[in-house]
Amino acid sequence: MAATDFIVAIELGSSKITGIAGKKHADGSIQVLALASENSSDFIRKGVIYNLDKTAQSLTSIIKKLESTLKASIGKVYVGIGGQSLRTIRNTEVRHLEEETKISQELIDSIMDSNREVPIIDQEILEVAPQEYKVGINLLADPVGVPSDHIEGRFLNIIARSSVKQNIDKCFKQAGIEIADYIISPLALANAVLTNSEKRSGCMFIDFGADTTTVSVYKNNILRHLAVIPLGAATSPKILQPAN
């Protein structure tokens, strides 16, 4: 099997690291070809890597298991990012135009680039969910083609501590594994579980992990809020025990 025949993704969880290889069909469905996991409770807590060496060793083991099943070498992998430091913040970018101008995609791209460049101390913007654009008195999801001398872009930025991504990079480099891209784990899971109708009408999606619980809120098919609570399946029974 050639490396281009399958896609590999790795999720760094607080209880286990999971690797999966699959083949995407024309209808968008995924056929699972291989699955492997390693316990991570000793070196990943609340989704944050605490021991780089042990994490790299587990990654190497998972890749070997997947390659053994696939009978092929793995070139690149997609990596899921989650954990306690993941959260959302809002930002607004305003552009005053010299005269009434038809809003172009280039202008929207420029506004989005400006939003990406907003400095956040010790944090990194991982993903952006555009909320809406205010043109005059109207709130629009897609303002391209609308004439105006003023536009206000409202964004929901998904951020995490810079060290989160840096430590992931170090572990994969130590393991000799190339990263194809990063995936925001809560978004990927919500997209796999929720329908467009559910996200459009409005819903809350809750994912209970071992050490954390992630809450995502959708409305009008747009992510409106994301938060990670430092409470999971492994800790909640202790908290729920009655006091003596």
Regions found by a protein language model. Name each.
Residues F172, L240-Q241:
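Hydrophobic alpha-helix position signal
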Residues S201-I239:
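Glycine-rich phosphate-binding loop of actin/hexokinase-like ATP-binding domains
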Residues M1-K16, I20-F205, I222-R224, A233:
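Nucleotide/phosphate-binding catalytic cleft detector across ATP-hydrolyzing
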